Amino acid sequence: DVVRREMLRVKDKTGNLSIALLKQLVAFGYQECQYVIVEGIFQKAIYHSFFQEMNHLFEGNVQVYYFDISFEETLKRHSQRNKNQEFGVVEMKRWWLPEDYLGLAGEQRLSEQLSEKQIIRQILADIQ
């Protein structure tokens, strides 16, 4: 959302300008960094092709995670954020897409029962 909402200020729709910039950022990371992390809420209908391209670029050496969190837990976590006044329940209900997996090989679900430490441990173990 930083790239799309804050830097480019574009709507989250198919073909939005942030996809091209994300591709460039990831390609730069591929050339210059040991690890590349793309984090955010990405709708399959909009971003699936982008992630397929990135999977191809990295020759399948990717880890994909889906936070499988209920709407109620999402609201709870949102209420604890600094930005919790920017939008509320009404907007979140409109945006909510349960089980919107990217559908990439090896995509893993992270449940709301996992602690932050458990998630970090799992990701670190996966990239070793």
Model feature map: region roles:
Residues 27-31, 56-60, 101-102:
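Conserved catalytic network of the ASCE P-loop NTPase/AAA+ motor domain
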Residues 36-40, 109-110:
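Short catalytic-loop micro-motif centered on adjacent basic/acidic residues
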Residues 40-42, 69:
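Short strand-turn motif at the edge of the Rossmann-like AdoMet-binding core
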Residues 58-77:
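Conserved phosphate-donor/acceptor-positioning beta-strand/loop module used by diverse small-molecule
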